[in-house]
Amino acid sequence: MLQQSMELIVPSLETLPQFVDALKRGWSPDNIRLEEAAREFLGMIAKDAAAFIARCTDREAKGGDVTLPDGSTVPRLPGFVRWMWDGEFCGQIGFRWQPGTEALPKHCLGHIGYAVVPWKRGNGYATKALGLMLAEARQEGLRWVELTTDPDNVASQKVITGNGGVFIERFFAEAAYGADRPELRWRISLTGPGPESQGRETGSM
């Protein structure tokens, strides 16, 4: 059953220790680079925790280039992350966009990505977090957002459809993500009734 106490919070130095603990327990907010990304985050935090927190809200894309799975780098997009919080750290959800358009660079797999820590899964937190993030995304003036999933990630697909998402296409990700990596593209409209009000009991993540 969904626990309604979960909310999205702006990352802070006060809540950072629980984020660090999750990384050390093997969780990663990056569903593709996984352990490599977790190690990078831990290194950044150890070097300058305040700077790491500041990078979590980067509407002007000043945080430096982004590293792709093959080690190549690409310019950062404007974006920000929120942490899922129910009195404890539950996971992360991020939103990125190109100002003035719904289009994304080909290397960018969707506007929104999320990851729940394993010990908080099964509470519907990803479904609720996505709905809450859609409300924030709507403020950027986009008509829709796109998300991508692996073809076999049924749980994440339910999170998306539970927030009004519709399937768009099956495609292959850029070579930087690995040869012949299939992905599914989904779209959620940000016009009309807010999808964040729909289906919050349907997701299992």
Say what each PLM segment does:
Residues M1-H111, P118, E136, A176-M205:
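GNAT-family acyltransferases
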Residues A137-T148:
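Conserved GNAT acetyl-CoA-binding A-motif
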Residues L16, N123, V154:
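Loop/helix-junction capping segments adjacent to catalytic residues or to phosphate/diphosphate-binding pockets
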Residues L147-Q157:
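Conserved beta-strand-loop-alpha-helix junction that forms the acyl-donor binding cleft
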Residues T148, V166-E183:
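Conserved catalytic-core motifs of GNAT/GCN5-like acyltransferases
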Residues G110-G113, V159, G165-E169, A179:
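Glycine-centered small-residue hotspots that permit tight backbone geometry or close packing
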Residues G113-V116, G122-Q139, K158-G162:
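Conserved acetyl-CoA-binding loop-helix of GNAT-fold acetyltransferases
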